[in-house]
């Protein structure tokens, strides 16, 4: 088993971005920055979070749940605590855990679900100071990723490993 310094883990959930638009996945070269990050770090090209809505992808990535015809687990009242998530696992191993979103995290019960299931901190729309652009789903991806980078740099200064789930929404619908 690995005995070195713990690696940081960042998962970027890019709303409505399919492989056909992502260069490193064999699609059109429309994502040069994502393509560059894929070359510098670990990028998984056989990961698929199924679902008919964004919240289904979120629950699949964080919990491993497969989609069901019922309401999303994130939205259910009794799922707001005690579900095992990747954040729980990493938190038990000394990681800082964080959800970063450009919109309002109370939407679809995300705030309650994440804080009750392993995420220690949430950054959402109210935490952005003078964003360059705010649309109907929240701040722009540029604002979101600048803030995410600031958070990563702060965690690095603290010398603690971190897990951050970054969820974009600016190209929703």
Model-derived features: positions:
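Soluble catalytic regions of membrane-associated enzymes that act on cell-envelope
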Residues: 1-173
């Amino acid at each position: 088993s690995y005995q070195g310094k713990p690696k940081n883990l960042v998962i970027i959930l890019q709303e409505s971005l399919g492989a056909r638009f992502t260069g490193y996945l064999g699609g059109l070269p429309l994502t040069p920055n994502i393509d560059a990050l894929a070359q510098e770090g670990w990028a998984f090209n056989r990961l698929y979070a199924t679902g008919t809505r964004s919240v289904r992808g979120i629950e699949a990535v964080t919990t491993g749940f497969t989609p069901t015809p019922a309401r999303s687990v994130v939205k259910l009242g009794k799922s707001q605590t005690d579900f095992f998530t990747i954040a729980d696992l990493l938190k038990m191993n000394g990681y800082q855990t964080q959800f970063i979103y450009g919109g309002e995290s109370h939407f679809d019960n995300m705030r309650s679900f994440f804080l009750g299931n392993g995420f220690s901190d949430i950054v959402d729309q109210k935490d952005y100071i003078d964003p360059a652009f705010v649309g109907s789903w929240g701040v722009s991806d540029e604002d979101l990723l600048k803030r995410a980078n600031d958070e990563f740099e702060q965690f690095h200064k603290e010398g603690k490993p971190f897990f951050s789930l970054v969820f974009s929404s600016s190209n929703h619908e």
